[in-house]
């Protein structure tokens, strides 16, 4: 509890003060007037808008897992704190909720005279793009996508995602202020050269949630990249793996990852328009790929070396220590009434495919101590014993089953009826 003497003396006054410093100003960071991010030591922001407009320091820490979302806002000089943990939404929604509640509290106790109006981006007339601006066209990347930016003479900018065909093209229009603005006027894009040969897309976005609140996110959204030129053998090696889903094998039996199909698998995909890339990763050699962009905040997070490794006679995809096995290397689940299987060397989870021979059959599993299993159809997890209990499950026709143990040699008895 914060009221306990131990809590009050856990950090020295000097350390508490250091935590509030604007550490983001010490490194690569976009120029910003306002944003929900501005790193301190451990804080996502140490000068959250709009509190800083009143000279009030607001410290923010948010976070998201697959199933839960949290946000903490502290006004240390006013003895006010907001915290929310939700099982839906996002940490940003929680932040907006806390922002509005704290502003209302400050208004009620007389600390501020009025709640500020929503942040507005300056409007400017559309204009043709000068040659200097048009020269910025090309390939740009962050850790989640690679886009091709085209800038037309009339000032229209089109950003097309090359790594996800489900993402629609984004359109912006050049303005007399020198920035590119989307149709709604909620997103402003500019190009920034760092003086050392790197070119960034600087983005200011209005975050607006009806009946909840408004804020702004300022970031370097992309870094300009060039097409890599790996060897023919390296390109062919990754193309041979393209189109295959890789599934997690070294998560624990209680991991959230197995509860959501999205978080338990990873797709390797090459693209004719992006030779030298596998997804957003630059191909280094036959076994290694890496995203070399360096961006602060969200656009550059979760960047890890991607390697193909051999373990215990099988090929795995290693992404920052998380191991995945290709669906092409999975066996079909045994169709006999009774079967026993064991976790392999390394204690990795074992994945199996279900087909027409399994469809409609009921599966019961006798689990080892602390073991778990999960069943998936083509779209989602339909049963995870850690969440749903160890009960019988009807198997889908085109699905997958994973058995998760704690150590090598853990035994699972499978009964099909």
Residue ranges and their predicted role:
Residues 1-417:
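Catalytic loop of the DD-peptidase/beta-lactamase superfamily, centered on the K-T-G motif
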């Amino acid at each position: 509890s914060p009221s306990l003497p131990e809590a009050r003396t856990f950090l020295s006054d000097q350390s508490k003060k250091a935590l509030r410093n604007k550490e983001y100003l010490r490194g690569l960071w976009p120029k910003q007037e306002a944003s929900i991010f501005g790193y301190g030591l451990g804080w996502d922001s140490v000068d959250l808008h709009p509190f800083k407009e009143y000279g009030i320091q607001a410290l923010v820490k948010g976070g998201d897992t697959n199933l839960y979302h949290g946000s903490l806002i502290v006004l240390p000089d006013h003895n006010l704190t907001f915290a929310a943990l939700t099982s839906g939404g996002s940490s940003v929604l929680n932040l907006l909720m806390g922002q509005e509640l704290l502003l209302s509290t400050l208004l009620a106790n007389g600390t501020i005279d009025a709640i500020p109006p929503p942040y507005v981006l300056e409007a400017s007339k559309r204009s043709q793009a000068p040659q200097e601006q048009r020269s910025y066209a090309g390939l740009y990347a962050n850790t989640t996508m690679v886009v091709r930016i085209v800038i037309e003479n009339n000032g229209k900018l089109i950003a097309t995602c090359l790594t996800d065909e489900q993402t629609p093209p984004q359109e912006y229009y050049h303005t007399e202020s020198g920035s590119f603005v989307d149709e709604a006027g909620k997103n402003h894009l500019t190009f920034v050269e760092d003086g050392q040969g790197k070119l960034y897309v600087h983005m200011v976005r209005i975050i607006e949630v009806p009946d909840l609140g408004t804020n702004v996110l300022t970031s370097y959204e992309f870094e300009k990249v060039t097409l890599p030129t790996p060897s023919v053998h390296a390109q062919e090696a990754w193309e041979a793996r393209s189109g295959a889903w890789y599934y997690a094998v070294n998560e624990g039996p209680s991991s959230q990852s197995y509860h959501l199909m999205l978080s338990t698998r990873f797709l390797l995909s090459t693209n004719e328009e992006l030779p030298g890339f596998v997804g957003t990763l630059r191909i280094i050699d036959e076994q290694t790929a890496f995203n070399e962009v360096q961006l602060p905040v969200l656009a550059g997070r979760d960047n890890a070396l991607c390697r193909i490794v051999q373990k215990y006679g099988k090929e795995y995809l290693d992404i920052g220590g998380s191991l995945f096995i290709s669906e092409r290397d999975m066996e079909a689940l045994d169709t006999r009434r009774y079967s026993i299987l064991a976790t392999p060397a390394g204690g990795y989870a074992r994945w199996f495919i279900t087909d027409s021979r399994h469809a409609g059959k009921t599966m019961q599993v006798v689990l080892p101590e602390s073991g778990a299993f999960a069943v998936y159809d083509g779209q989602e997890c339909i049963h995870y014993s850690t969440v749903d209990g160890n009960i019988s499950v009807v198997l889908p026709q085109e699905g997958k089953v994973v058995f998760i143990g704690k150590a090598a040699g853990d035994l699972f008895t499978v009964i099909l009826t």
